[in-house]
Regions:
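Generic structural signal for buried aliphatic residues
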Residues: 43-44, 57, 69, 90, ...
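Serine endopeptidase catalytic core focused on the charge-relay Asp
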Residues: 87-258, 267-268, 276
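Short, Lys/Arg- and Gly-enriched loop/turn segments at beta-strand edges
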Residues: 49-60, 221-223
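PDZ-domain C-terminal substructure recognizer with occasional recognition of PDZ-binding tails
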Residues: 4, 38, 58-98
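Conserved PDZ fold ligand-binding element
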Residues: 32-54, 265-268, 272-273
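Short beta->alpha transition motifs characteristic of CBS
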Residues: 273-280
Length: 280
């Protein structure tokens, strides 16, 4: 139930947009589109240069100097290749490909559990995805940092609402090892306060009263009352429908809002799941 800040760097440069270029010949061109690249493609090499970040992409385009360069990229989990020829952008005085790329992401999430003996943690309840493309970010490295919740946009019909937070320190309190379908997982050497609790078996979870641990102000988690209305094994990422019945939480946030993902769900003294999505 403790909030944390996330800083994550991707494996390769993710294409998040395109921008046409005025070529020296007077025509408008887009080398990236001409090469068959699409939004959401992850560029991992241009020529002989591995594009681990945005600066490496710029370096690779400069190295090509208008010559055709092989581009290795990943689309839908499959590695592919194409050929791209950068053009000279006189206005920017540099070689360009006509694509916008992103190499990192940052945000706020909620811690689900920490195993104090093994020093591992889980949080967020869903993968970290790029805000423009919706693609899950391929993890190169990542860390979590202390965070404080400073405000909230209330959830309403058709609008999910959102917790707002700020990073309290640049000092990492944990390293992210996995950006998976059910959340982020990693290691930490920092002690977290909390209550030790067994994990329920699937058959022990039942519809009815339950609680969530969440932080909607400051840094301290609180327990709020919810009801588990439906249990399903059909979707491995969404096993329960949970309704907030706690008046204090409804007054402050309107229900589950973005940023509460990862909040642990408790029932009968056991950890039974985590908040993953907001219904709007």
């Amino acid at each position: 139930g403790t909030p944390f800040g996330v800083k994550m760097f991707s494996e390769g440069a993710l294409i998040v947009g395109f921008s046409d270029i005025d070529s020296p010949g007077g025509s408008t061109v887009n080398p990236a589109k001409a090469a068959g690249l699409r939004l959401g493609d992850r560029v991992i090499r241009i020529g002989q240069i591995r594009t681990e970040n945005n600066d490496a992409v710029k370096e690779a385009l400069e190295a090509a100097r208008g010559s055709a360069a092989e581009v290795i990229y990943v689309r839908s989990g499959e590695q592919r290749s194409t050929t791209l020829t950068p053009v000279w952008d006189a206005a920017a005085a540099q070689w360009r490909a006509g694509m916008w790329v992103r190499d990192s992401s940052a945000g706020v999430g909620t811690l689900t559990f920490v195993d104090p003996e093994k020093g591992v943690f889980a949080g967020l309840g869903h993968p970290i995805s790029d805000g423009d493309t919706g693609e899950s970010i391929a993890l190169r490295s990542g860390e979590i940092v202390p965070c404080e919740i400073t405000g909230c946009s209330m959830g309403t019909v058709g609008s999910p609402g959102e917790l707002k937070g700020k990073f309290l320190s640049a000092h990492a309190i944990g390293s992210i090892r996995i950006n998976g379908e059910n959340g982020v997982y990693g290691t930490t050497r920092t002690g977290f306060s909390g209550q030790t609790m067994p994990v329920a078996f699937a058959q022990e979870v039942e519809t009815g009263n339950a609680q969530i641990l969440a932080t909607v102000a400051g840094e301290t988690p609180r327990t709020y009352h919810v009801r588990i209305e439906k249990i399903s094994d059909a979707d491995p990422r969404r096993n329960m429908v949970v309704r907030v019945v706690d008046k204090a939480l409804l007054t402050r946030t309107g229900g589950i809002v973005q940023g509460m993902s990862g909040s642990p769900i408790l029932q009968n003294g056991r950890l039974v799941g985590a908040v993953t999505h907001v219904l709007v």
